[in-house]
Amino acid sequence: MTLKDLRIGESAKITAVGGEGALRQHFLDMGVVPGAEIKLMKLAPMGDPMEFRIHGYELTLRLADAEKIEADPIACETVCPKPAADAGKSGEKQEDQDRRGRKKEARAAAKSHHPGLGEGGIYHVKTDGKPLPEGTTLTFALAGNQNCGKTTLFNQLTGANQHVGNFPGVTVDRKDGVIRGHDNTLVTDLPGIYSMSPYTSEEIVTRQFLLDDKPKGIINIVDATNIERNLYLTMQLMELDIPMVLALNMMDEVRENGGTIRVNEMEEALGIPVIPISAAKNEGISELIDHAIHVAQYQEKPGRADFCDPQDHNGAVHRCLHGIMHLIEDHAAKAGIPVRFAASKLAEGDQMILQQLELEENEKEMLRHIICQMEEERGMDQAAAIADMRFAFIQQICGATVVKPHESKEHARSVKIDQILTGKYTAIPAFVGIMGLVFWLTFGVIGAWLSGLLDMGISALTELTDAGLTAYGINPVVHSLIINGIFEGVGSVLSFLPIIVTLFFFLSILEDSGYMARVAFVMDKLLRKIGLSGRSIVPMLIGFGCTVPGVMASRTLPSERDRKMTILLTPFMSCSAKLPIYGFFSAAFFPGKSALVMIILYFTGILVGILFALIARGAVFKGEPVPFVMELPNYRMPGAKNVGQLLWEKAKDFLERAFTVIFLATIVIWCLQTFDTRLNVVTDSQDSLLAMLAGVIAPVFAPLGFGDWRISTALITGFMAKESVVATLTVLTEGISITSLLTPLSAAALLVFCLLYTPCVAAITSIKRELGGKWAALVVVMQCVIAWLCAFAVYTIGGLL
């Protein structure tokens, strides 16, 4: 049978893993290995994909992928033996005894003292040794799985001392920061990954950074509540032979659930410092920093890199790895790749490492012979054998050092919440309700109220400044520039800052809580109908906040096809920068119905995006989306510090644009509107330079009902930044009501055009970095054409009604 044949609640033992290439390796890296026990938890509301529990965590697979994995069913008696008729009470007593035993063992382990610096041991202060030269910058790589608290730890380590950039040659985000109180350090926050296999761009970037940049130390953060899954990456990092510390995050949750980890024993077994921490509560951070700096300063490398049992299957894997190490030792040294890491990667079939080593043909033949012999003795193919070796070691370590609770409160809570949020009949209504609530609170309650308060403050400041300049008797031209150009232009945009921050606040909560992963699970089958994976929903939802991070979020998609298609769809998701446009026109033409107008616009963008995807799938992006293999983390309350820092970054970015791009745009527009070709001040704006330039393209918009040159000018400046549309119109319509330029129908057509036409320069630049100049140019032309056609349809059909 295959995993596809399992029913909900049934368990099985995996016997064979199908598939090929990088996908199959990804299955193995996620713990889907022969011999592993797996249980079907549920199906998505539409019947596909499936949610399994394996190695203590939830994993999603599509039916088509589950069909590639063979398994033997585990009888119910094996999984949950039925108690005898008279054994009910004794069974309850036994469960109570087990629970008390776990708590007693946890208390005993919690009392075990973890030695700090200066208390002896290889990882502690010593008087001898050869430390790095004084003044050397201690560079660290912060590595870990997704959803393990890595961002929280990075913020705790560095505070505000962060710099955001990109890794060389690629578009994956890179964050660097200096550890607080240690100016000679530099921490690089690597992307969250599950293994060092080249499946996603993040994994490739992480591997190349560690191999090429060779940091002085690695801080490996793991989720202590899901330690079996996380230690798989730890083992591969240890093979790099770089000084390393292991940060056991969320230890507070482990203790609260009656479990523990015997840190000292794990430290001894792994041969690296193991530090229990809680990044969210700032517990154990100072000890982690002390140990990290110490191992980096003294270059104390992991004391263990050999994880295979010499007795397992007559040492088949052990002999294979050591044979490969002996074969490639010189080549690995020449290529600058740690020999143990290179050997294990060759053993599992990593072609990128094979190319880097530049082996001779006879050496390649010998390598194939060594691997074939191992496969024959082990009874598994090479990739499965190496993955099995790693998980066998992890089970051995965890069995000796980890006291697990029967079920964590976080997991039990997540199961209950998922009954509604991923339930067969409740998931989609819940999603619509949650997103509707977010938009309602943002546009109709919290954001709108705060925006009104800020607008009142800006208006008061404008009046005060106006009165002061008038009393001072400043030159009328300068007076007009300051009040009509800068204050009214920039101020009209600034008043929408609360709405934008409010939207990002809710989106960050949905993402950090773990709900976005559930949305991907729920929507996968629906998105497959338009040629996308469920993972694509996350970048598109982020696109509601801003197209730039939405485009960047597509980097996590393993398929180039899915990534391109998702990037092209993201601009159809109305970004928060367009909110000032919607608010400005809906307040003028549809008073009292602003929230309804905005919601209609958002759903219009989604609908047009779906239609575009269906056409693109049949014409350009033929084929099927990549497999849906994803971990579903437990629900967690987002950290206030992380959310606050994100909001500050978004607010700062908005303010920087308001006082740079928009500020300059308003000044340029004011100058063009104020002067004629001879630089004389005009009394009628229709005689201005701006009117002359905008008049050239105004006829293009005449069939849409907004052929006025002032509207055309505003749309052009909107290409710089969407917020500039309102700022420009505010400057150009001084003393004129916007209702005199447009009718409600033409305003509706204009809103649709603004919804769909080309994204701002920042978004186009981001698309260019991701896909190249041709695709970026295509997006500009394509979005303008689609926007024109849709606006024309609205204006024409509306005129017939």
What do the PLM-derived regions correspond to, one by one?
Residues M456, A460-L464, A517-T547, K622-L646, ...:
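Juxtamembrane inter-helical linkers in multi-pass membrane proteins
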Residues E377, A384-A385, K404, V445-I486, ...:
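Extended, low-charge hydrophobic alpha-helical regions
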Residues A430-L441, L503-S508, S586-A588, L601-A616, ...:
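Hydrophobic core segments of alpha-helical transmembrane domains in multi-pass membrane transport
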Residues S576-I599, A762-G772, A793-L801:
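Transmembrane helix-loop junctions at the membrane interface of multipass transporters and ion channels
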Residues H182, R207-V274, I581:
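Conserved C-terminal guanine-recognition region of P-loop GTPase G domains, centered on the G4
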Residues L421-F521:
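Core alpha-helical transmembrane segments of integral membrane proteins
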Residues V245, R255-H406:
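Alpha-helical transmembrane helix bundles of large polytopic membrane transport and channel proteins
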Residues R107, K111-S195:
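Conserved G1/Walker A P-loop phosphate-binding module
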